Amino acid sequence: MAEGNTLISVDYEIFGKVQGVFFRKHTQAEGKKLGLVGWVQNTDRGTVQGQLQGPISKVRHMQEWLETRGSPKSHIDKANFNNEKVILKLDYSDFQIVK
């Protein structure tokens, strides 16, 4: 498998004005557009968290989007990514918004 096609999984948490600005909906749409799977949810800390899975090149693109763009009315202060690992298969079949 070529480097750019290696499947990875990474957890994320986004800080800033990311709740009440359709951040989850836009994250789901961007993830699906890139062909990624995973999930996104609001936390009781006022952040958004989730997990991305897919080819490393697509996950890197999504990480940049989460750090710099987000939804139009969001303001991202910080993006944390952790638990990155190579995976052999995807754990999800879609990109879901978790309530």
Swiss-Prot record:
- Expressing tissues: Organ-common type isozyme is found in many different tissues.
- EC numbers listed for it are 3.6.1.7
Catalytic residues of the enzyme: R24, N42
Please indicate if the UniProt record lists RNA-binding as a keyword. Answer: no
- Where in this chain does the record put each Acylphosphatase-like domain? 9-99
Q: Which reaction does it catalyse?
A: an acyl phosphate + H2O = a carboxylate + phosphate + H(+)
Name of the protein: Acylphosphatase-1
Q: Per the similarity annotation, which family is this? A: Belongs to the acylphosphatase family.
Sorted alphabetically, the Gene Ontology BP terms of this entry are: phosphate-containing compound metabolic process
Instruction: Give GO MF terms, alphabetically.
Output: acylphosphatase activity
Q: Which residues form a coiled coil?
A: none
Keywords of this entry: Acetylation, Hydrolase
- Which organism does this record belong to? Homo sapiens (Human)
Q: Which Pfam families match?
A: Acylphosphatase (PF00708)
InterPro entries, A to Z? Acylphosphatase, Acylphosphatase-like_dom, Acylphosphatase-like_dom_sf, Acylphosphatase_CS
N-acetylalanine is found on A2
